[in-house]
């Protein structure tokens, strides 16, 4: 998705599905070789490729997809393999992880400062600047080569708007190289 000259790629989106009847942990373990881990059961699917987590309430959390349609297909696959009805499946969208590129270098080591719209610190361990974007309610990890990863976003469009906003802020503060 390109907005304002910035191409945003969704890397992952957590999606939770609430079936009419809760999914039984024991059924997933015995019928599909799911793995119990505390109060959850984990099952990796090959087609569609996804990791499915059955939470303590019997809801289905799908991890490892970047499209809601693929996550829904994974949840339906699980239900059908268990012999359960897949109708009435409610969808709840979780956070998005996305990436984009500023297409220029960034002086990340000089980004320990307050900006209108957020705060930035340089993380020496990661080798990037971390922007807590209060305007768009997400976090940006910015590397010196211009590569950026957004986490905690609620929608890809918010990442795109954040990318355009921060590109302008970095230009304004002479931090783009």
Could you tell me what each predicted segment is?
Residues 1-141, 145-147, 153-177:
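Intrinsically disordered, low-complexity polar/charged tails and linkers
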């Amino acid at each position: 998705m390109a907005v304002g000259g910035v191409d945003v790629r969704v890397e992952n989106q957590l999606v939770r599905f609430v079936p009419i009847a809760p999914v039984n942990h024991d059924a997933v373990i015995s019928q599909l070789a799911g793995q119990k881990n505390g109060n959850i059961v984990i099952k990796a699917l090959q087609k569609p490729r996804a990791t499915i987590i059955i939470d303590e309430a019997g809801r289905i959390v799908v991890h490892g997809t970047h499209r809601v349609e693929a996550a829904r297909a994974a949840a339906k696959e699980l239900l059908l393999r268990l012999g359960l009805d897949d109708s009435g499946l409610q969808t709840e969208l979780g956070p998005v992880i996305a990436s984009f590129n500023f297409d220029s270098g960034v002086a990340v080591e000089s980004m320990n400062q307050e900006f209108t719209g957020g705060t930035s610190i340089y993380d020496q361990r990661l080798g990037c600047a971390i922007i807590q974007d209060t305007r768009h309610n997400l976090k940006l990890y910015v590397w010196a080569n211009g590569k950026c990863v957004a986490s905690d976003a609620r929608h890809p469009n918010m990442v795109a708007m954040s990318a355009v906003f921060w590109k302008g802020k970095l230009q304004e503060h002479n931090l783009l190289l």
